[in-house]
């Protein structure tokens, strides 16, 4: 049930939040400071997919890559092969139906460490979105390709003295037990 909520959040809530955001072209033009923010697509993004949250990761990363005008190639964890390939089918179909070009969303089919390393080191890849274990995230940073990663979850919780203690404890327990504590 928690995975369903994650997929719903990764798709509907994220889409609703960003659908009207301008991400390409002139985003902001401050005439007073004479500063302009310009969004430019990076090109091809490689996305590492963990075994713990494969479907929501694929949905979310597809949305943010396409919204920013980029292509994305996924490298799923071998232990999540079936659900990752199914999620990829769904997002590829949705992208095509929305008018995206063929091949803008894809994934490697040979799920080996060597294939992932080759993808991360490719000169055609502009950015790696690394979600996964510590070793894979380190390998992404060591590849020489710019990398954005999510670190390990399960951070500590702090209850400030003015907080409603019962509510804070309830919220912490809910957050730590949601999806068995998997971020």
Which residue ranges define each predicted feature?
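ALDH superfamily catalytic-core signature
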Residues: 67, 137-183
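A glycine-rich helix N-cap at a beta->alpha junction
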Residues: 93-108
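N-terminal Rossmann-like NAD(P)+-binding subdomain of aldehyde/semialdehyde dehydrogenases
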Residues: 1-34
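General beta-strand structural signal in soluble alpha/beta enzymes
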Residues: 56, 74, 106-109, 129-132, ...
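A structured beta-alpha segment of the ubiquitous adenosine-cofactor-binding alpha/beta core
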Residues: 23-37, 106-125
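Short glycine/serine/threonine-rich phosphate/pyrophosphate-binding segments
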Residues: 53-60, 66, 84, 130, ...
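Conserved acidic residues
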Residues: 43, 125-126
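Substrate-binding/gating loop at the entrance of the active-site cleft, primarily
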Residues: 27-72, 77-89
């Amino acid at each position: 049930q928690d995975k369903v909520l994650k997929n719903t959040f990764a798709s509907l809530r994220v889409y609703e939040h960003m659908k009207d955001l301008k991400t390409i072209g002139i985003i902001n033009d401050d005439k007073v400071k004479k500063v302009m923010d310009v969004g430019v697509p990076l090109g091809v993004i490689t996305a590492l997919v963990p075994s713990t949250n494969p479907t929501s990761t694929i949905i979310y990363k597809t949305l943010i890559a396409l919204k920013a005008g980029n292509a994305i190639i996924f490298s799923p964890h071998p232990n999540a092969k079936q659900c990752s390939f199914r999620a990829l089918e769904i997002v590829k179909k949705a992208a095509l139906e929305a008018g995206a070009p063929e091949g803008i969303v894809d994934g490697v089919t040979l799920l080996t460490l060597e294939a992932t390393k080759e993808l991360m080191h490719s000169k055609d890849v502009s950015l790696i979105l690394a979600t996964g274990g510590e070793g894979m995230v380190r390998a992404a940073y060591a590849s020489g390709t710019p990398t954005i990663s999510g670190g390990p979850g399960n951070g500590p919780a702090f209850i400030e003295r003015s907080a409603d203690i019962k509510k804070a404890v309830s919220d912490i327990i809910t957050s730590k037990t949601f999806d068995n504590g998997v971020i």
